[in-house]
Amino acid sequence: MGSVRTNRYSIVSSEEDGMKLATMAVANGFGNGKSKVHTRQQCRSRFVKKDGHCNVQFINVGEKGQRYLADIFTTCVDIRWRWMLVIFCLAFVLSWLFFGCVFWLIALLHGDLDASKEGKACVSEVNSFTAAFLFSIETQTTIGYGFRCVTDECPIAVFMVVFQSIVGCIIDAFIIGAVMAKMAKPKKRNETLVFSHNAVIAMRDGKLCLMWRVGNLRKSHLVEAHVRAQLLKSRITSEGEYIPLDQIDINVGFDSGIDRIFLVSPITIVHEIDEDSPLYDLSKQDIDNADFEIVVILEGMVEATAMTTQCRSSYLANEILWGHRYEPVLFEEKHYYKVDYSRFHKTYEVPNTPLCSARDLAEKKYILSNANSFCYENEVALTSKEEDDSENGVPESTSTDTPPDIDLHNQASVPLEPRPLRRESEI
């Protein structure tokens, strides 16, 4: 498999936790000590929540307001809708008030507010602030009632009409663009992309594998969908530096290209626990007492808008089920395939799963019994056969002696005949 890239930087800092963990000796990459510590510590807060939101708060950010205003468009796209509507209304009302004040000042300086004055006014029928405000609204929104209008008496009034028209177009373009960008954000697409509640570790093709399941609830496809994962845990460097959240890549097939998936029906993502895996030295007992978090990410382009979306979730160590597999969800009907999402999060236990680490398994410290290696579908098949035999009256053997002509070693090596699962009614 590919190499593991480790990011050598800290994301969160906690001096108190750092001093406390610096004195601890934890095995399997969780510390510098050599002795194993199986007393579970208090679990840290989840870095990425189940719904994909990052559990992070930024404090003591210098010049935060100025930085957000410098990128005002992104700020408007990211803020909540209620604040977006407030900005939308304020932008128009303030511009109307500003230009209404300008037209009122022009009328005041020209003497148009004096009813006894004779002569041509700069803006006809503008003899109060209310009239100037209404004229500003009519100019910017191009309503044009025809009752008030600018004349050629004052060039400054003509210039302000032109200037307000340009400003109004800029405000319209900015606000409408921000609203459309906010509506087109693929964030809500994540509501129809789901991860399984638990990850599992089980044997697959003779190797221990970490697996989790992803599904797409919509019929529209996710274009160029691909997955990646990272393991977050604290560690202490050889120099004694405490890193509270060290990020380690988990290989899900990036080098071979199998990280790209065709997400039409639910798919199980597989991470082979090999010598490059951060889980290579962890046994079931180590997993049960470990304190780490696996962040899983699904990325792809929304078919309708071609915009990239990212769906995230995470699994803590206590959310990884050792010796379990996922129940099947895809069933073949007569002319189509059916996906049963009621089984999406369900798992079943595989009793013969080795409890040792992948390293111990590779070094053949654990002998896997072939005689007890039943897959879920074969268990179902055997159960159905026993029920049929009991209904047909086939007598069961009561002898406990082993016949002399049967070789138990050869019998254990004979694999079970696979039985494909083709109908939901069979299970």
Swiss-Prot record:
Stretches within the membrane that do not traverse it: 129-140, 141-147
Residues involved in K(+) binding: 255
Motif position, PDZ-binding: 425-427
Effect in UniProt of substituting residue 305 to P: In LQT7; there is loss of function when the mutant is expressed alone and a dominant-negative effect when expressed with wild-type channels; channel trafficking and assembly are not affected
Outcome after substituting residue 172 to N: In SQT3; gain of function
Sites bearing S-nitrosocysteine, chain numbering: 76
GO cellular component, one term: dendritic spine
Disulfide feature: 122-154
Chain intervals for the UniProt region annotation (Polyphosphoinositide (PIP2)-binding): 181-208
InterPro entries assigned: Ig_E-set, IRK_C, K_chnl_inward-rec_Kir, K_chnl_inward-rec_Kir2.1, K_chnl_inward-rec_Kir_cyto, K_chnl_inward-rec_Kir_N, Kir_TM
Intracellular or extracellular location(s): Cell membrane; Cell membrane, Sarcolemma, T-tubule
Residue span of region Disordered: 384-427
Residue intervals on the Cytoplasmic side: 1-81, 179-427
Tissue spec. comment: Heart, brain, placenta, lung, skeletal muscle, and kidney. Diffusely distributed throughout the brain.
Residues spanned by motif Selectivity filter: 142-147
UniProt-listed GO biological process terms: cardiac muscle cell action potential involved in contraction; cellular response to mechanical stimulus; intracellular potassium ion homeostasis; magnesium ion transport; membrane depolarization during cardiac muscle cell action potential; membrane repolarization during action potential; membrane repolarization during cardiac muscle cell action potential; positive regulation of potassium ion transmembrane transport
UniProt-listed Gene3D superfamilies: 1.10.287.70, G protein-activated inward rectifier potassium channel 1 (2.60.40.1400)
Modified how: S-nitrosylation increases the open probability and inward rectifying currents.
Keyword entries, A-Z: Atrial fibrillation, Cell membrane, Disease variant, Disulfide bond, Ion channel, Ion transport, Long QT syndrome, Membrane, Potassium, Potassium transport, S-nitrosylation, Short QT syndrome, Transmembrane, Transmembrane helix, Transport, Voltage-gated channel
Homology family: Belongs to the inward rectifier-type potassium channel (TC 1.A.2.1) family. KCNJ2 subfamily.
Function: Inward rectifier potassium channels are characterized by a greater tendency to allow potassium to flow into the cell rather than out of it. Their voltage dependence is regulated by the concentration of extracellular potassium; as external potassium is raised, the voltage range of the channel opening shifts to more positive voltages. The inward rectification is mainly due to the blockage of outward current by internal magnesium. Can be blocked by extracellular barium or cesium. Probably participates in establishing action potential waveform and excitability of neuronal and muscle tissues.
Quaternary structure (record): Homotetramer. Homomultimeric and heteromultimeric association with KCNJ4/Kir2.3. Can form heteromeric channels with Kir2.6/KCNJ18. Associates, via its PDZ-recognition domain, with a complex containing LIN7A, LIN7B, LIN7C, DLG1, CASK and APBA1.
Name of the protein this chain belongs to: Inward rectifier potassium channel 2
Source organism of the structure: Homo sapiens
Gene that this sequence comes from: KCNJ2
